[in-house]
């Protein structure tokens, strides 16, 4: 048990003082008036600001490393950099690339998550940004690798990492996109609209499918 004291705590939309934070394990267990708890290791944060860690759900890389490197040391470097800047967990985000390259990246994320205890921000899973997007809104994605939404292709990509994808960016105006979104939702994957040329009406329809 650890007690964080003498900090400026962001709570209920405002910065507050005169409060202590009780930490049990890796979670905030309680927040009470200063001096409520007498037992436990007390850490004086000397007036620093205390706020919940950020969760970054869309990040391809940082500090010279990229998720598509498909290397655990790259993920370690990204995680360490994020933690040093207030982000405590993140979704490793892939780019539109060849199927083997996406598979390699997802496999590396899976191995990293199942491996030894790591320092830095925690990887919660993967965010697949593409390849099921609109080539007319490709941005930095490789146009030659963009493909229509397809359940079989997704299952091929994730055959060895079936539970690693937590979020999918999808262009809902593409053929079969809504059926594909229903399939992803049934698997517990959050679907987000992105890299799209969808109209307002198409977006409203997509929202009715849980996107």
Regions inferred by a protein language model and the residue ranges of each:
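Short amphipathic alpha-helices and their capping/turn segments at secondary-structure boundaries
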Residues: 40-41, 46, 105-120, 204-208
């Amino acid at each position: 048990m650890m007690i964080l004291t003498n900090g400026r705590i962001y709570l209920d939309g405002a910065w507050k003082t005169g409060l202590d934070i009780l930490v049990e394990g890796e979670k905030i267990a309680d927040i009470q008036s200063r001096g409520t708890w007498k037992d436990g290791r007390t850490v004086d944060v000397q007036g620093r600001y205390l706020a919940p860690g950020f969760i970054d759900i869309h990040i391809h890389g940082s500090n010279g490393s990229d998720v598509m490197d498909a290397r655990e040391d790259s993920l370690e470097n990204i995680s360490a950099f994020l933690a040093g800047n207030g982000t405590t967990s993140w979704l490793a985000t892939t780019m539109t690339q060849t199927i083997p390259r996406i598979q390699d990246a997802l496999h590396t994320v899976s191995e990293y998550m199942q491996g030894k205890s790591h320092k830095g921000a925690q990887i919660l899973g993967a965010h697949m940004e593409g390849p099921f997007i609109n080539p007319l809104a490709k941005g930095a994605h490789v146009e030659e690798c963009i493909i229509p939404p397809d359940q079989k292709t997704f299952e091929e990509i994730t055959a060895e990492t079936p539970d690693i994808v937590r979020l999918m960016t999808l262009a809902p105006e593409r053929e079969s996109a809504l059926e594909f979104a229903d399939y992803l939702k049934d698997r517990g994957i959050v679907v987000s609209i992105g890299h799209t040329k969808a109209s307002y009406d198409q977006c409203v329809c997509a929202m009715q499918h849980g996107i």
